[in-house]
Structures are given as structure tokens and as C-alpha cells.
Amino acid sequence: MDWDEYEEKGLVRKAFVDREHIKSLMKMSQAKLDFAAKQAIDESSSSIILVLYYDALREVCEALAILNGFKVYSHEAFVHFLKYKLSEDEASRIFNRYRRLRNGVNYYGKPVSAGEAAKARSEVPELITHLKEKYLKEFN
């Protein structure tokens, strides 16, 4: 499905730029990053920690969508938003990877390894920093 199809199906809609909502999303994203960074990663915590990192990234993507005048109702649509609206191919790839891992945890009870959570701990904050510095400086 491409971006236009998401719009046609109502999974993405035009929205007004709500600056307070963007600020709130950025604050929640940072809180999740801060909390996740303090947690020890082991086999029993790794899935929970990965989901926290994914949620922090998704909230930044939601803030970006709102800033660009969109309300997104599908996590998968963020993959296309990053790639086709922002031309962020690598960000799109990384987001999609963590989206799939998170879906495995949340919908299928599939655990992720401590190594995957450790990778998220280094990769996700780096990507969030890139997106914030490039697009969301005024909301930091």
C-alpha cells in the first residue's frame, strides 16, 4: 500500500498542526527513553524494553506527522510517511524493523532477545536525535 492508499482508506487524514500535542508527544517520548535507559536488559526484560523504545520512536513519528498536517491511524503508515513524505529511507527501514519486532511481542507473544533490546538501546535514541534535530528543534 502506498501513501495515497492510506489516505483513501482513512488510515491517514489531514489534520491541523497542533503544537501542544507535538510538545506532549515529545515529552512522553523522552520519558520513555529515559525510563528504558535505566532498566537492566536481560531475557525477562528485553521485550518490554524494546517496546518502550519503539513507542518512543513512534511518538516522535506521530509528532512529525502532525507537524506536517497529518493524523496517522496506522503504525505501518509511518513507514511510508518517513520514506515518501520526509525522504528518510534509513529512518523508514529502522522504524519498520522495530515495528515488526514490537508487533511480534504485542500480538503474538514472541519475545525478543537481550541483544535485540541492546541494539534498540543504541539505535533508537540515535534515530530520534536525528529526527528531532532535523525537524523538531523548536520542540526540544
Model-derived segments and their meaning:
Residues M1-N140:
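Terminal alpha-helical segments
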